Amino acid sequence: MGQKSSKVHITKTDRAILEVKRSKDEIHKFTRRTDNLILVEKSQLKDLIRKNPENYKSNMKVRFLLKRIHYQEHLLQQASDQLINLENMVSTLEFKMVEKQFINGLKNGNEILKKLNKEFSNVDELMDDVQDQIAYQNEINETLSRSLVGTSNYEDDLDKELDALESELNPEKMNNAKVANMPSTEGLPSLPQGEQTEQKEREEFATEERSDTKEPLALLS
């Protein structure tokens, strides 16, 4: 009589753990791809700012691309948070009590991954045909408005971020702006003649002191 092999019983918890592992692998894959996509889009954003130095903040493509980058970052964070939530459910001793929540959470996680996958399709078309992407733009705006509770004006924050990028690309322009904003001395009263003479004497004395301290150093060399 041969010994019968014992049949391995796979529990619902085992299946849930397997699903979480699959989700984790998918999220890691999409994270790498999305990070690379965001780097490319940030480079495109800088190019657009260079090409539109005067009206980059009012340029529809510029604003749309920056919002899209924020949207992608938000999706990645959502996917990561959802995965942590699922892992916590699986680790509970009473998995049956949260099984329904787990299944719903898994569905939500898959929906997020579908949205991330959509970001890789027709990237150039989305950039070149912004006017025809009304539904997509609305989805981005609604998602960001829900995720940025407490932010008084998201559009103002976009302006500040674009200004920071423009300053990074054109530091000389920013320095010139700082100089232009310095208070002017025009119209201020001149120093009285006696004070001008004293100031001149102090400057000459300081110059002589500097030259005196340099002479011993020259002798030592």
From Swiss-Prot:
Residues 72-178 form a coiled coil. The keyword Lipoprotein applies. One of its GO terms (cellular component) is cytoplasm. Keywords: Coiled coil, Endosome, Lipoprotein, Membrane, Myristate, Protein transport, Transport, Vacuole. InterPro entries: Snf7_fam. A lipid is attached at G2 (N-myristoyl glycine). Residues 197-215 have a biased composition (Basic and acidic residues). One of its GO terms (biological process) is intralumenal vesicle formation. The keyword Coiled coil applies. It is found in: Endosome membrane; Vacuole membrane. Changing G2A: Loss of membrane association. It is a peripheral membrane protein. It comes from the Eukaryota. Residues 170-221 are annotated as: Disordered. Gene3D superfamilies: 6.10.250.1710. Belongs to the SNF7 family. Present with 937 molecules/cell in log phase SD medium. Class E VPS protein implicated in concentration and sorting of cargo proteins of the multivesicular body (MVB) for incorporation into intralumenal vesicles. The lumenal sequestrated membrane proteins will be targeted into the vacuole after fusion of the endosome with the vacuole. Acts a component of the ESCRT-III complex, which appears to be critical for late steps in MVB sorting, such as membrane invagination and final cargo sorting and recruitment of late-acting components of the sorting machinery. Core component of the ESCRT-III complex (endosomal sorting required for transport complex III). ESCRT-III appears to be sequentially assembled as a flat lattice on the endosome membrane and forms a transient 450 kDa complex that contains DID4, oligomerized SNF7, VPS20 and VPS24. SNF7 oligomerization into a membrane-associated filament is nucleated by association of SNF7 with VPS20; the process is terminated through association of VPS24, possibly by capping the SNF7 filament. VPS24 subsequently associates with DID4/VPS2. Interacts with the VPS4. This is Vacuolar protein sorting-associated protein 20. The gene is VPS20.
